[in-house]
Amino acid sequence: MLTTLKNAFKIKEIRQKILFTLGMLVVIRIGSLLPVPGVDTKFFSQWFAQQTGGAFSFFDAITGGSFLNMSILALNINPYITSSIIMQLLTIAIPKLEEMQRDGEDGRKKMVAITRYVTIALALIQSTAMAIGFGRQGYLIEFNALNVITAITALTAGSAFLMWVGERITEKGIGNGISIVLVINIISRLPQDLSNLFEQFVFGKAPATAILAVVIIFAIIIAMVVLVIILNDGVRKIPVQYAKKMQGRKMVGGQTSNIPLKVNTSGVIPIIFAQSIMQFPIIICSFIGYNGTGVWAEILKGLNSGYWCKPSQPIYSLGLLLYIVLIVFFAYFYTSITFNPLMIADNMKKQGGFIPGIRPGKPTSDYLNKILNYIVFIGAIGLIIVSVIPYFFNGVFGASVSFGGTSLIIIVSVVLETMKQVESQMLVRNYKGFLED
């Protein structure tokens, strides 16, 4: 690993890309310290500390602490991620967008521009809701039009700036810029989470107990990382044979190919969707100062991951069951709109391709559907295990950490993808890469 990094820095182009990326990440961390003008950050921090559960903890984790500090980067790149998902879904529903996506480089540029506009619109909506909510709850120094407009402008500009930084990293740096921005924010909270764990389970304990706690903590982390790597890189390859045919005086075709089906075909999307649906009511109620009464108060607690897996309050773990069901549902739903077995089977038939032992056309489509349903189920189970383990330890053992399965999946997938990109650039220049170390 160290030799590979050393070789990478020997190559001027790669060195410049790495240094540019690191420079942009430093700028982001500095920006996370700049408070939103007009917001009483001290009072807001006190309110945040009183919030129970994972809704705000997760949101703060992916913003790298910017939400807790109520900095100008508090919205993070969440509007951009939401915008990208919306555009991906609309591309399937709206033929014009689908045609634009297939229209080469020009179409891609138009899609990127539309995604930017949708991002700004979503950032405006979110920042407006936050600014007005802050004013009503007394988190603004003074609730007036100037402070509200200032907060809206600062939060929207911060989100737009992060989008711009992400695009610049993609263009001039290493890896996918948006993903790297998200990862650096998550990683910035790891020292605090590890400190909390050690303070709670290691420091002040008997030596034997402390050593056992350290071993268990790192064993769980390593096991989760290994599982995420398997989910990220696991692939089921469906063999495809192409029939031979005469073209002029030559016999062409007869090649063997495959259709790679990833174990985790939907990535982290099912978890993000499930969390968004369950945490949205909690966040809205918190901002407007409504804690609920009667049945509604119990429902809010059930939706709050901070109450899950608590032995003294098992009824609220029904919310965890709903969370699991939503993950499975969105795993199948998202895969169904991004992978079309019928279209693949039709294209294979037109090109003279077939799966050995399976007739072309509908039988091929049915076979792909059957395999895909099995793979999606396995992937969903993996996602559930990775995402539920942190909730289990938080509830049963009171481990107060914001770092969860979603964060781990994002970090591992982005790190692996970035390593592969550096690897490919190293191999072009005849250097060994990470995968050969």
What are these regions (language model features)?
Residues M1-Q101, E105-D437:
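N-terminal cationic and glycine-rich segments that engage phosphates or anionic surfaces
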